[in-house]
Amino acid sequence: MYWDVKKVAPLPDYRIYVEIMDGRRGIFDLKPYLDHGTLRELRDENYFKQVGIVFGAVTWPHDQDIAPETLIAEMTPVDDQPEDSFLRIVEHGA
């Protein structure tokens, strides 16, 4: 679907960079979720970095996920920044 996630990358401080199929890009902060249920496991930074995409949703190996609708509603858009600057953030974890 048009709101599926097409790219995700871990960032410092429990944030992720996401790109949505419709072209939106943003930074999603997971800190508010880290004390809830199965998402507690994401506090392990090495595990957090194993983020991926399954069926258009952001996921981790033990079945934690963030729905695209939640990402879109709560992410901080980065559309006003050049794409290459965010590629550097993703590649270098700055």
Question: Which residue stretches match the model-derived regions?
Answer:
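Motif-centric detector for short Cys/His coordination patterns
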Residues: 1-94
